[in-house]
């Protein structure tokens, strides 16, 4: 482990390897490269001090270097203990960006690193957060509430909360008043994923959101592409790398049929699996049925299916009672943000055999075993390398534009959750068309007037559902 200077990575010697893969990724990320061309000279993020908490992958490296090219100072950690690509982290550290991320880091280290991305060398404060899942945002807000005298650190509900609270208490003791100062210095947060967005909306509804936020997840060019087409490619990749199991003919159960569930079902179906879906939402259930999937109760298929994947963003979707009933060597994994979709904590007193990194064999008293991928965390990033560069370019271009919006136009945003305007969503899509050889039909003035739009767009109303 390298700890010199202002970074923590597994092996700085991997930097050259990481740089080669970053160079390849740049050719697959036209949106981000276009941002460098368009905004590089003006440097709209000059003066921005961005704390980034997002999977430290090769694709994220391209995002980080785009933010730097636009004038920002950046400090970065991964938002998941298993999702870091160590060569990507090394390349970014070698380029001079403080990064704190190691694949397989402990939960204790995870929260130490989350603290470090707010600790600038000159003692200054971050003024922007780029978040994925909301952990960086919640770290600051919880600490500020504790400083205000609220009893928010006394009753942890999980091992992770216990570790988080301990880290907050450590910072409270070392730097009294720091959390409140840091909270008040934030101009805005841009949030990448469904789970983090839900956290922000809950804060906003309670009047507890202390700065503006942009919900990047619900940009069409994020949720309908990253969540769907990204999962369509990366889910099966993770299962294959983790297990080498043939999926053709297997029965796979996808829990949830939102955008991530849709992509996951398509991924497994494309690999030849016979896919069944569980859903609580009647609209999503109807979509699944009309897409040709049998919509079932988990309890009715738990003893017969071969593969189980959670995609919901909810907790306790697959519980210990379900896993006890699974057939021998059933594969269990999650592609939602947090590890509590599967009741992993309830498995800890059973016999675990580690097969290889992020693949564990868990044996029940009756003798049946399950294969658990990435300890219930994101298997596409834990067991593989996540979504392909091209689809992440769309997501990260949204992130870049959102950071520019909040940093350069603070007077236009109050302490609410916003979505990027439609013209920027369409811009992100346009930036990715040439790479695929797409040619757009041009509406005439008469055609545009007939449907009530500008010939140059936006082409859909804000409430249109793609």
Curated annotation (Swiss-Prot):
Gene Ontology CC, one term: cytosol
Pathway connected to this protein: Amino-acid biosynthesis; L-homocysteine biosynthesis; L-homocysteine from S-adenosyl-L-homocysteine: step 1/1
Co-factor binding comment: Binds 1 NAD(+) per subunit.
Molecular function in Gene Ontology: adenosylhomocysteinase activity
Statement: the UniProt record of this protein carries the keyword Cell wall biogenesis/degradation: no
Cysteine pairings via disulfide bonds: none
Keywords from the named record: Cytoplasm, Hydrolase, NAD, One-carbon metabolism
Catalytic activities: S-adenosyl-L-homocysteine + H2O = L-homocysteine + adenosine
UniProt-listed Enzyme Commission number(s): 3.13.2.1
Cofactor(s) needed for function: NAD(+)
Keyword ATP-binding: no
Domain of life: Bacteria
Cross-referenced PROSITE patterns: ADOHCYASE_1 (PS00738), ADOHCYASE_2 (PS00739)
Function as written in the Swiss-Prot or TrEMBL entry: May play a key role in the regulation of the intracellular concentration of adenosylhomocysteine.
Family: Belongs to the adenosylhomocysteinase family.
Protein name in the entry: Adenosylhomocysteinase
């Amino acid at each position: 482990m390298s700890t010199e200077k202002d970074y923590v990575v597994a092996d700085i010697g991997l930097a050259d390897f990481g740089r080669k893969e970053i160079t390849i990724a740049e050719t697959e990320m036209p949106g981000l490269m276009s941002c460098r061309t368009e905004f590089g000279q003006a440097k709209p993020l000059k003066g921005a001090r961005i704390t980034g908490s997002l999977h430290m992958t090769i694709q994220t490296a391209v995002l980080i270097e785009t933010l730097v090219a636009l004038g920002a100072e950046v400090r970065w950690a991964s938002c998941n203990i298993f999702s870091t690509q160590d060569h990507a982290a090394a390349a970014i550290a070698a380029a001079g960006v403080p990064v704190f991320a190691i694949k397989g880091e402990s939960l204790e280290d995870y929260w130490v690193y989350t603290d470090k991305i707010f600790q600038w060398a000159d003692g200054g404060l971050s003024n922007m957060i780029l978040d994925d899942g909301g952990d960086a945002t919640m770290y600051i807000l919880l600490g500020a509430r504790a400083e205000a005298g609220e009893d928010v650190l006394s009753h942890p509900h999980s091992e992770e909360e216990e570790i988080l609270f301990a880290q907050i208490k450590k910072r409270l003791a070392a730097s009294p008043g720091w959390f409140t100062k840091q909270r008040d210095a934030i101009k805005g947060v841009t949030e990448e994923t469904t789970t983090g967005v839900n956290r922000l909306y809950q804060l906003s509804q309670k009047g507890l959101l202390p700065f503006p936020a942009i919900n990047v997840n619900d940009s069409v060019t994020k949720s309908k592409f990253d969540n769907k087409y990204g999962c369509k490619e990366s889910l099966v990749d993770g299962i294959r790398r983790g297990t080498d199991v043939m999926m053709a003919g297997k029965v796979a159960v996808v829990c949830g049929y939102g955008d991530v569930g849709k992509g996951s079902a398509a991924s497994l179906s494309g690999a030849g699996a016979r896919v069944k879906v569980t859903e609580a939402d009647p609209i999503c259930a109807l979509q699944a049925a009309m897409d040709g999937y049998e919509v079932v109760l988990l309890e009715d298929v738990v003893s017969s299916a071969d593969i189980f994947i959670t995609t919901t963003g909810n907790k306790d979707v697959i519980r210990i009672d379900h896993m006890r009933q699974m057939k021998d060597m059933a594969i269990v994994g999650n592609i939602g943000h947090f590890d509590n979709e599967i009741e992993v904590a309830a498995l800890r007193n059973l016999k675990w055999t580690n097969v290889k990194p992020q693949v564990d064999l868990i044996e029940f008293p009756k003798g049946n075993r399950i294969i658990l991928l990435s300890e219930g965390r994101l298997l596409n990033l834990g067991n593989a390398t996540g979504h392909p560069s091209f689809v992440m370019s769309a997501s990260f271009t949204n992130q870049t534009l959102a950071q520019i919006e909040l940093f350069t136009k603070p007077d236009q945003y109050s302490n609410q959750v916003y979505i990027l305007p439609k013209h920027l969503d369409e811009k992100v899509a346009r930036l990715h068309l040439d790479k695929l050889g797409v040619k757009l039909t041009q509406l005439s003035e008469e055609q545009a007037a007939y449907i009530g739009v500008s010939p140059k767009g936006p082409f859909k109303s804000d409430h249109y559902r793609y």
